[in-house]
Amino acid sequence: MKKNKNINFKPKWLRVKSPDKYNNIYKISNYNNLNTICKSGSCPNIAECWEQGVATFMILGNICTRSCKFCGVKTGKPNKIDFYEPKKIAHNIKIMKIKHAVITSVDRDDLKDMGAIIWGKTIKAIKNINEKISLETLIPDFKGRKDLINIIVNEKPEVISHNIETVRRLTKKVRTQAKYDRSINVLKYIKLISNIRTKTGIMLGLGETEEEVIQTLKDSRNANIDIITIGQYLSPSIKHFYVKKFIPPYIFKKYENIALDMGFLYVESGPLVRSSYNAYKHIFLK
C-alpha cells in the first residue's frame, strides 16, 4: 500500500477550530472510561455535537476483530464482555444530559452472537432510564444473520444505521471482511420487517468515480434506505488506506441534490460530514 505524502496537507475547507465548549461531556467520558467514537475517531464535529447534547458511544470494547483499511479503531483480540456495560452506558448518558445518543460498536466476530445480546440490553437500559431520549444504533453487519438483526429491531430504536462506506468496486480493498451486497441487504431486511428509519453512509476520496457514487446512491435507495451521509475520507495514519483525492464542497452539494431527487428523506453531504453528524435531526423527519 502506498503512503500518501500529502496526507497532512489538507485543503482549507477541512480545517476546523479546536473545540472549547464541551468540557462537561469530555470530563465525564474520561472519568468513567467510556469509549466514544467522537474521540477515538477524531471527529471534526465533536464540539458542535457535544454542545447540542449529542454523542456517539462505542460498546463491546475498543478492539475490533476486523481490519478495515479506512478505520482508526484498533484490531486484535478483544477483551472479555463487560456484562454491566449496558447499565453503565445508560447511567452515564443520563448524568451527561444527553438528548440524543448514537450507539455503535466494534465488530465482535469472536462471539457466537457477535455482540447482539449486549446491543439489545444496551438499548433497553437506555430507554428504561430515560424514555424521552432518542436513539440511533449504528450496527455492524452481523454477517447478515437475521436472528441477530432481529434483536436490534425488537428494541425499536428510532434509527438503525449501517454504513456501506464505499462503492462496490472498492469494498474489498477498503473493508476487507465486509461485503457490499450484505451491507445493503442488512438495511433492506430491517425495512422489510419494521417501520424503523434506516440510514447509511459513504466516504469520498478513495478513488471512486462519479458513476460509482451515483450507483451506490441508487442501490441504497432501492433498499428503501431513508437517510444517507456523504463525507470526505481522511486517513487515520500512513498505515491506512491513503486519500486519493480531496473532494471540493460543490461536488458534495451535487451529490446531495442527486440523492434528494432519488427520494431520500434526508441527506447530509459535505467534506466534514460524519455518520452521526446532525443525527438528532433525523428522528424528526416526516
Swiss-Prot record:
Pathway: Protein modification; protein lipoylation via endogenous pathway; protein N(6)-(lipoyl)lysine from octanoyl-[acyl-carrier-protein]: step 2/2. It comes from Karelsulcia muelleri (strain GWSS) (Sulcia muelleri). Its main location: cytoplasm. Gene3D superfamilies: Aldolase class I. PROSITE patterns: RADICAL_SAM. It catalyses: [[Fe-S] cluster scaffold protein carrying a second [4Fe-4S](2+) cluster] + N(6)-octanoyl-L-lysyl-[protein] + 2 oxidized [2Fe-2S]-[ferredoxin] + 2 S-adenosyl-L-methionine + 4 H(+) = [[Fe-S] cluster scaffold protein] + N(6)-[(R)-dihydrolipoyl]-L-lysyl-[protein] + 4 Fe(3+) + 2 hydrogen sulfide + 2 5'-deoxyadenosine + 2 L-methionine + 2 reduced [2Fe-2S]-[ferredoxin]. The keyword Nuclease does not apply. InterPro entries: Aldolase_TIM, Elp3/MiaA/NifB-like_rSAM, Lipoyl_synth, rSAM. It is found in: Cytoplasm. The lineage of its organism: Bacteria, Pseudomonadati, Bacteroidota, Flavobacteriia, Flavobacteriales. Belongs to the radical SAM superfamily. Lipoyl synthase family. GO terms for molecular function: 4 iron, 4 sulfur cluster binding; lipoate synthase activity; metal ion binding. This is Lipoyl synthase. Keywords: 4Fe-4S, Cytoplasm, Iron, Iron-sulfur, Metal-binding, S-adenosyl-L-methionine, Transferase. It is an enzyme of class 2 (transferase). GO terms for cellular component: cytoplasm.
